[in-house]
Amino acid sequence: MKKAILATKVGMTQIFNEDGVLTPVTVLQAGPCVVTQVKTVENDGYDAVQVGFADIREKLVNKPVKGHFDKAEVPYKRFLREFKFENASEYSVKDEIKADIFAAGDKVDATAISKGKGFQGAIKRLGQSRGPMAHGSKFHRHQGSNGSATTPGRVFKGKGMPGHMGSKRITIQNLEVVRVDVENNVILVKGAVPGPKKSLVTLKETVKAAK
């Protein structure tokens, strides 16, 4: 991996391309990210670049993290993430990673925490079928069978049941970068990206490029 950046989700809109085709896009405020540490094989056992994103007040930073930022002589940041760049040696502390690291036509993977839906039933959470809707039916949205009776006499692990839905780390692969606004550090990505507005999104060059 050579390209990655942290961003916040602004929302969705739609744009027309050169052929007049309407395309739904997600607007991402990407960077600028500041390099807070460069890790090397000699010192850390692997090559990586640690970046900070989104300014934060000093009183909201604990002492160990504050010392880390002070050592790097960079502003305090809300998020710290690490990317295993193949070209990590090309970066230095205080360098900035901006939206221009990507270009229109690039394929990226977007990772974020999905929207939380709370406690949901098996129909909404897992797409299970509902029961008969006739007047004499014993249930409509209740779950069906959970397994056999005496044998095995238990519910198997992994059985789909009602429970908490959402708030999971989701990655959408092979999204196309439609447009990059270098001046405002904005990236437009084709399609939807997980998470609510203002949530943190990690953009990386895709690991499964379309053939």
Curated annotation (Swiss-Prot):
<comment type="subunit">
    <text>Part of the 50S ribosomal subunit. Forms a cluster with proteins L14 and L19.</text>
</comment>
<dbReference type="GO" id="GO:0022625">
    <property type="term" value="C:cytosolic large ribosomal subunit"/>
</dbReference>
<dbReference type="InterPro" id="IPR019927">
    <property type="entry name" value="Ribosomal_uL3_bac/org-type"/>
</dbReference>
<dbReference type="Pfam" id="PF00297">
    <property type="entry name" value="Ribosomal_L3"/>
</dbReference>
<comment type="similarity">
    <text>Belongs to the universal ribosomal protein uL3 family.</text>
</comment>
<dbReference type="InterPro" id="IPR000597">
    <property type="entry name" value="Ribosomal_uL3"/>
</dbReference>
<dbReference type="GO" id="GO:0003735">
    <property type="term" value="F:structural constituent of ribosome"/>
</dbReference>
<keyword id="KW-0687">Ribonucleoprotein</keyword>
<comment type="function">
    <text>One of the primary rRNA binding proteins, it binds directly near the 3'-end of the 23S rRNA, where it nucleates assembly of the 50S subunit.</text>
</comment>
<keyword id="KW-0699">rRNA-binding</keyword>
<keyword id="KW-0694">RNA-binding</keyword>
<dbReference type="GO" id="GO:0006412">
    <property type="term" value="P:translation"/>
</dbReference>
<keyword id="KW-0689">Ribosomal protein</keyword>
<dbReference type="InterPro" id="IPR019926">
    <property type="entry name" value="Ribosomal_uL3_CS"/>
</dbReference>
<dbReference type="GO" id="GO:0019843">
    <property type="term" value="F:rRNA binding"/>
</dbReference>
<feature type="region of interest" description="Disordered">
    <location>
        <begin position="130"/>
        <end position="154"/>
    </location>
</feature>
<dbReference type="InterPro" id="IPR009000">
    <property type="entry name" value="Transl_B-barrel_sf"/>
</dbReference>
<protein>
    <recommendedName>
        <fullName>Large ribosomal subunit protein uL3</fullName>
    </recommendedName>
</protein>
